[in-house]
From Swiss-Prot:
GO BP terms, alphabetized: translation
This protein's UniProt keywords: Ribonucleoprotein, Ribosomal protein, RNA-binding, rRNA-binding
UniProt name for this protein: Large ribosomal subunit protein uL22
Coiled-coil regions listed in the entry: none
Job description of the protein: This protein binds specifically to 23S rRNA; its binding is stimulated by other ribosomal proteins, e.g. L4, L17, and L20. It is important during the early stages of 50S assembly. It makes multiple contacts with different domains of the 23S rRNA in the assembled 50S subunit and ribosome. The globular domain of the protein is located near the polypeptide exit tunnel on the outside of the subunit, while an extended beta-hairpin is found that lines the wall of the exit tunnel in the center of the 70S ribosome.
Quaternary structure annotation from Swiss-Prot or TrEMBL: Part of the 50S ribosomal subunit.
GO cellular component entries: cytosolic large ribosomal subunit
Length: 119
């Protein structure tokens, strides 16, 4: 059984979020949460929240289907980060000029599945 969670318009750059996502791809869900909990990068928090949401979605799906739910059997099957909208801001510079600042956003997707379904 698979469960998916998506966070859209997260204010973290896609490049930095992809670094976190690459750490957890293919790992057990509980191990991935531990990795993200102790990662010093700021992007680890939104990725961890999406992962926890995917685990909760798997729990709800298992309850609806009447299947037993074991969190230890979940594996991060698929995870990726897409680029969201870019907020464009300007910073005043010398001699009346302005420099553009891009505030990038990300769409983070995490799919968890049982070990049996992953093979």
């Amino acid at each position: 059984m698979e469960a998916k969670a998506i966070a859209r318009h997260v204010r973290v750059t896609p490049r930095k979020a992809r670094r976190m996502v690459d750490l957890i791809r293919g790992k057990k869900a509980t191990e991935a949460i531990t990795i993200l909990k102790f990662a010093p990068q700021d992007a680890s928090l939104p990725v961890r929240k999406v992962l926890e949401s995917a685990i909760a979605n798997a729990r709800v799906k298992a309850d609806k289907a009447g299947e037993p739910f074991r969190e230890n059997d979940l594996v991060v099957k698929e995870t990726y980060v897409d680029e969201g909208v870019t907020l464009k801001r300007f910073r005043a510079r010398a001699q009346g000029r302005a420099a553009r600042i891009n505030k990038r956003t990300s769409h983070i997707t995490v799919v968890v599945a049982n070990k049996e379904g992953n093979r």
